[in-house]
Amino acid sequence: VYKRQQQEPTREHLLRDAKTLAFFIRKLFEEDIPQELYQLLPRTDATYIVAPPAHKRVQRMRVCFQYSDEQYLYVTPLDEIADEPLRVRYNIPQINEEFAETCRLLWRHAQLNLLDVSVDEAGFLTPSFIVLEPDYLLDISSLAECYRDYGHHPANYFLSRLQPIENARPLLLGNIANLFLDEWIHAEGEVDYLKCMRKAFRRYPIELAACADLRDREKERQFFDDCKLHFDHIRETVNDTFHAAGYELDKTDAVLEPSYICEALGLQGRLDYMQRDMSSFIEMKSGKADEYAIRGKVEPKENNKVQMLLYQAVLQYSMGMDHRKVKAYLLYTRYPLLYPSRPSWAMVRRVIDLRNRIVADEYGVQLRNSLEYTAQKLEEIKASVLNERGLSGRFWETYLRPSIDNFQEKLSSLSSLEKSYFYALYNFITKELYTSKSGDVDYEGCTGAASLWLSTLAEKCESGEIIYDLRIKENHAADEHKAHLLLVPSAPPGMPAEDASDVLPNFRQGDAIVLYERNSDADNVTNKMVFKGNIDFLNENEICIRLRATQQNSSVLPSDSPVSYTHLTLPT
């Protein structure tokens, strides 16, 4: 215990533990404690004070970092005026020790979300989570993919960004498996495999035609054999496993590919399958699980487990669902294996610390806008840095290391002028991305994707960035070829119909938007399921929204519930 927490045992704590062990042995073997040992044992027990008793608890606080010392972070709240900085206790064992690296990277005026905050009688804050720059949303899948076989360094995130996306068989197989799941979930009877494959060819014609692997006869045959295997396994899972005792999965009340924006944790993501009441969800994987960790047993890979944990955390902090009551499953369609995920909040804290380190790197690059600094950061993308677990041997040298070395080899082959151009372009894109997410601090008002939750409803209405209190006139969300909704605008509550025309929206045909159900003033994109789409057409009487994904469960978008949509500026 002392080694794990990197603490040296004090004499009184050591004697306390010795006393506990001595009395345990006495009870177990019914033998008296030796006299010389008994005289050394304390008469009263010392206790570890992990954190002072809580006077009150706060679910979430947004604060601005000022400075720190060895014990406290000194912060000011954003929603009220404080005469003195608040003191935040950090690096507390078993509470928030996972954020030690985050606290080392903080800069003056950095914004933090403090979650699950315990406030003692002296007013000191002890949060369970410290989220750096929460307005900068990271994609859950991209963050989880930082967990590799060889380690989880933040540079893995930037390596994935700089590597080209290959149109390979595994990616195609995953897309087709998602199509199979959609078909089996909404099928009333049997599903024809050949019809599904024809639909796959209509949906992914370019990808299938351009896939280099499918030009090889043997690989092509294996690919379509795999498609049939995954089709059969998904059928078995939906028709049989869903109804097995303990799973409580009802395909008739399911939502496919729901999206969530979690400002609390600085994350966004999209699930494969979820019950409409959010009691259960499934993340599907068409690739291999870990077949070698335990002999004769298939275990989920670490990156997949991380992804599940983050979804559980998002449902808790965005939707108010207790993670202990949400059943999360990983579906490996290759076996098939429907694996129940077990929540570990300590692991979630470690992943959020990794997220914070990535955001700090992004902030540093866009702030300095320096070719030398960017070159230094990208120099971290090398095997000696990323191989945190010290792997060696044939698997590392043949399959893992080449993809890392390939980046540095290509970078080193550039001329000095080409490198300067690359670093300058990288800086430009990073700054634009940062601004598009978090907004421009020099701009009056809220900008970027963060304005979705930072701007008030009145501010959005004034700038024409939202249209709300819409009604669904026609629901064609299940249309395979053109999933869309026809919305009818009406006057906002409390506004006479003749004055509704005074509200001028700032929307045009083709604009990317995010749609969500809005039944009260408290509803927004951070606490409701969101649907992404584009404006197909709009006029004074109706608005047509083209959805990015079909949604065959009509109860997800009820016709009697008002909806709102606002501009979507998230990179997607």
Tell where the protein language model's regions lie, with residue ranges.
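Conserved small/polar residues in nucleotide/adenosyl-binding loops
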Residues: V1-Q5, T566-T572
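Charged, low-complexity interaction regions that mediate assembly/partner binding
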Residues: R16-P77, Y363-P496
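Conserved ASCE P-loop ATPase motor domains encompassing nucleic-acid-directed helicases/translocases
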Residues: A51-D120, K431-L568
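A non-catalytic, helix-rich entry segment at domain boundaries
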Residues: A51-K56, F180-L256, L433, D442
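Mg2+/Mn2+-dependent nuclease catalytic core
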Residues: P77-W107, K251-R357
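Charged, glycine-rich intrinsically disordered N-terminal tails and low-complexity linkers that flank
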Residues: R87-R89, I95-A212
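Extended, Lys/Arg-rich, non-catalytic nucleic-acid recognition/anchoring regions
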Residues: G246, Q316-S318, R324, Y329-F395, ...
